[in-house]
Amino acid sequence: MMSAHKYELMFIADPELDERGLKKLTEQYLELVTKEGGSFDEPDYWGRRKLAYEIAGKTEGNYVVVKYTAEPATSDELDRVLNLNESVIRTKILRKG
């Protein structure tokens, strides 16, 4: 990897997803990171929480936070594919340091 950076991803998934479905969804996206030569820490599942305001007709969501290292293009692609999934209500990727 030439220019890998550290990132923190938080996404909010549909509250209707059970624990197994949420883990499967998370693993699907983290595969993209490893396939492109990146690495990640163990995902932190915060569970179902009330949203500050309604998003896409939902008042609750399953929160997941993952720290990972990847190239900027991989991070951009991860954000793009997360936003295409209807089970993902909101995403935020922050570059760390």
Swiss-Prot record:
Keywords: Ribonucleoprotein, Ribosomal protein, RNA-binding, rRNA-binding
CC per GO annotation: cytoplasm; ribonucleoprotein complex; ribosome
Regions that span the bilayer: none
Pfam families: Ribosomal_S6
Coiled-coil positions: none
GO terms of biological process kind: translation
Domain of life: Bacteria
Residues spanning the signal sequence: none
Gene Ontology molecular function terms on file: small ribosomal subunit rRNA binding; structural constituent of ribosome
Stated family: Belongs to the bacterial ribosomal protein bS6 family.
HAMAP family: Ribosomal_bS6
UniProt function note: Binds together with bS18 to 16S ribosomal RNA.
NCBIfam families, per database record: S6 (TIGR00166)
Name of the protein in its database record: Small ribosomal subunit protein bS6
Organism (species): Bifidobacterium longum (strain NCC 2705)
Classification lineage: Bacteria, Bacillati, Actinomycetota, Actinomycetes, Bifidobacteriales
